[in-house]
């Protein structure tokens, strides 16, 4: 049996090797290791010519700005490079033993770095107004915040009122406008709770005790179950005050209510529904708005600080280019620009409302006539009752570039794919902190990626492509900017980029195969479309990689099963004998999503703040 096992195991390894490396097949048909897409090479056809920026003709930026960019084409992928010929023009600048060819793969060296700025992906919900999820409480559907990233500097402004939204909601005989949005006082106190208080409260909870302060605050708010419904997945949002180190649970999930039909701005009418809106205000700089879904690794995957000496751009075949079509506003400083971006960012606020009796009118009538059914049928936020439940999924004008010299804020809704090194700019997002900045532009990114790609190709071609005279072939990637001009393998003398703190050089004499359209979309130029005709327009197919992974996994599983069967038969037999003794196995572990005690809401048998809804529909009395 052991011989059989060895034979099968060796066969499995050989099968795996054949799948991944092949026996004489064309190596360019297989993906790179640790890369989603293999970077094959096509015949080099890029003869030096006078450099032209491939941006749309309506682009108005100065040439020196464009030269500092590094952008990538995300939807143009490699094709076969069999029969690639060296470019004579490129050989002249290098030693006689080097033959330089240019890859046709338009990859993006910024992909990993820029992942956190793909807000639709990393946040996945509204920013200005976040109501991206629905949840049921006691048989009624509600909307609630669901963004996966913290929103720094976000708060709620109550119109024509000195009441802060972090004040507890009105209870008992208080007028509506005497209260804010936060949880009412409880015994023991659950909101606001200090950071040290939360640490102490969850010190024995392995899942929570070591979380950072923002994630801990989010989980603490999610510990409260509305309306004694332990099966509900409704979780309250929260705001963390970084200055006071306190976590405030928000009793009201609504973030916007404006217009005469829905609220009354008259301060004298204290018991009417108040108007409010989300904002990034000076007084909110220490606040961070949190949903129940904030990920515990947000520091790695979400943007926080603004990027100094940088502006967002689009990767366009080897260089990062300006985004040609933006909305430009005046802004005195970074804070004002960040505030403008936030105001235009993704929003889940409903766009349609009932034609007759509105939600807020129902609420007011319910209070006035003590009609509990009217209160129960209504629901914050505005328009959620018989109205559209619009979800932005994070799509909006979420990015901006602030020019410190011209005091202009350039806002756009296309996902940036790279950064331009420019000493005049600060790159910001709607999620980012309104004033915090970091200055650590990755100047060596291009050089490192160029060297990595050249080394990767060299390993693949090995000695097979060396000619009889011992000349060495170099496959240069399509990266035409670097802080090391020799690494560019440029057929002409690279030019230094102006306003660059990294001292970048750009190669302008290699023809670019992509350009930016009028809607900020990067596309392959018309004359090169035939070469990329068989390549998917937006994303590469990963069928081959999936087959390889699945086959390798199957072989590994087979080998593991054989090993277990041959060497642990006796141990397994003993375990099978115990199957009739369930008492020996103990209790099952609880689910992670039930890790917090639902009774920790501290309400006990006392009357809750609301018996009908997770948000303010009737005044609780204590």
From Swiss-Prot:
It is found in: Membrane. Disulfide bonds join 149-302, 217-247, 263-275, 320-418, 337-409, 443-502, 490-507, 492-509. It is a single-pass type I membrane protein. The keyword Metal-binding does not apply. Coiled coil: none annotated. SUPFAM superfamilies: Apical membrane antigen 1 (SSF82910). Pfam families: AMA-1. Residues 577-607 are annotated as: Disordered. GO terms for cellular component: membrane. Keywords: Disulfide bond, Glycoprotein, Malaria, Membrane, Signal, Transmembrane, Transmembrane helix. Residues 1-24 form the signal peptide. Residues 25-546 are extracellular. Glycans are attached at residues 162, 286, 371, 421-422, 499. Residues 568-622 are cytoplasmic. InterPro entries: Apmem_Ag1 (IPR003298), Apmem_Ag1_dom_sf (IPR024056). The chain crosses the membrane at residues 547-567. Involved in parasite invasion of erythrocytes. Belongs to the apicomplexan parasites AMA1 family. This is Apical membrane antigen 1.
């Amino acid at each position: 049996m052991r011989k059989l096992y060895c034979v099968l195991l060796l066969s499995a390894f050989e099968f795996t090797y054949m799948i991944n490396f092949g026996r004489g097949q064309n190596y360019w048909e297989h993906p790179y290791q640790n890369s989603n897409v293999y970077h094959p090479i096509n015949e080099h056809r890029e003869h030096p010519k006078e450099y032209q920026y491939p941006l749309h003709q309506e682009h108005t930026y100065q040439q020196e700005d464009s030269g500092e960019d590094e952008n990538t084409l995300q939807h143009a992928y490699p094709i076969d490079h069999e029969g690639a010929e060296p470019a004579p023009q490129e050989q002249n600048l290098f030693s006689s033993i080097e033959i330089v060819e240019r890859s046709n793969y338009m990859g993006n060296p910024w992909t990993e770095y820029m992942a956190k700025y793909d807000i639709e992906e990393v946040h996945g919900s509204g920013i200005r107004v976040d109501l991206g999820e629905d949840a049921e409480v006691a048989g009624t559907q509600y909307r609630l915040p669901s963004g996966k990233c913290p929103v720094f500097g976000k708060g709620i402004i109550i119109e024509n009122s000195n009441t802060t939204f972090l004040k507890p909601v009105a209870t008992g005989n208080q007028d509506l406008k005497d209260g804010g949005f936060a949880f009412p006082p409880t015994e023991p106190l659950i909101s606001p709770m200090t950071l040290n208080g939360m640490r102490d409260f969850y010190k024995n909870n392995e899942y929570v005790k070591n979380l950072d302060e923002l994630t801990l605050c989010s989980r603490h708010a999610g510990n409260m179950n509305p309306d004694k419904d332990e099966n509900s997945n409704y979780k309250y949002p929260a705001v963390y005050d970084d200055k006071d180190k306190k976590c405030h649970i928000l009793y009201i999930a609504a973030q916007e209510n404006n217009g005469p039909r829905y609220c009354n701005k008259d301060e004298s009418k204290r018991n009417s529904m108040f108007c409010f809106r989300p904002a990034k205000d000076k007084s909110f700089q220490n606040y961070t708005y949190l949903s129940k879904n904030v990920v515990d690794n947000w520091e790695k995957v979400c943007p926080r600080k603004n990027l100094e000496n940088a502006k967002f751009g689009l990767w366009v075949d080897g260089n990062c280019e300006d985004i040609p079509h933006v909305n430009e506003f005046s802004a005195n400083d970074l804070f004002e620009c960040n505030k403008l971006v936030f105001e235009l960012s993704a929003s889940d606020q409903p766009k349609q409302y009932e034609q007759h009796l509105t939600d807020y009118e129902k609420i007011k009538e319910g209070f006035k006539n003590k009609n509990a059914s009217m209160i129960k049928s209504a629901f914050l936020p505005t328009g959620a009752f018989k109205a559209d439940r619009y979800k932005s999924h994070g799509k909006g004008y979420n990015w901006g570039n602030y020019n410190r010299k011209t005091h202009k804020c350039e806002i756009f809704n296309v996902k940036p794919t790279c950064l331009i090194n420019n000493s005049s700019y600060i790159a910001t997002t709607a999620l980012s902190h309104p004033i915090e900045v970091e200055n650590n532009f990755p100047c060596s990114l291009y050089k490192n990626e160029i060297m990595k790609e050249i080394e990767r190709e060299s390993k693949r071609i090995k000695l097979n492509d060396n000619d009889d005279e011992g000349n060495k072939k170099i496959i240069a990637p399509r990266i035409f900017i670097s802080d090391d001009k020799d690494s560019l393998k440029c057929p002409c003398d690279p030019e230094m980029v102006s306003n660059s703190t990294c001292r970048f050089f750009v190669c302008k004499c290699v023809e670019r195969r992509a350009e930016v359209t009028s809607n900020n979309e990067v596309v392959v130029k018309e004359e090169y479309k035939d070469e990329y005709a068989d390549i998917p327009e937006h994303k590469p197919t990963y069928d081959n990689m999936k087959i390889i992974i699945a086959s390798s996994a199957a072989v590994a599983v087979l080998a593991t099963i054989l090993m277990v069967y041959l060497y642990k038969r006796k141990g397994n037999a003993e375990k099978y004998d115990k199957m009739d003794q369930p008492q020996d196995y103990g209790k099952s572990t609880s689910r992670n999503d039930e890790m917090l005690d639902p009774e920790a809401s501290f309400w006990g048998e006392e009357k809750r703040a609301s018996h009908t809804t997770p948000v303010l529909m009737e005044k609780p009395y204590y």
